[in-house]
Amino acid sequence: MILLVQVMRMISYQPFYETMLKRGITEYHLIYKEGFSANTLHRMKHGQNITVKTIDTLCFILDCEVSDIIQYIKDD
């Protein structure tokens, strides 16, 4: 008998929210001052995927690194 073990992996956007807080930037600012998509913010809140271009845009707006936007979490 072979047991299959599923390894859960996920990308967390928690660093993004921490970076926004440190920079004093709100979702309102991103949407209405930077033209960022409210739908994309919704997707991030619900742990859904976003594009590399979106990550690039957020890094530019927030003047930060990719690790300040996303974190890879592996559930062992």
Whereabouts are the PLM-identified features?
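A short, Lys/Arg-rich alpha-helix, primarily the initiator
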Residues: 1-29
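Residue-level detection of the helix-turn-helix DNA-binding "recognition helix"
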Residues: 21, 35, 46, 74
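Short alpha-helical DNA-recognition segment
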Residues: 24-42
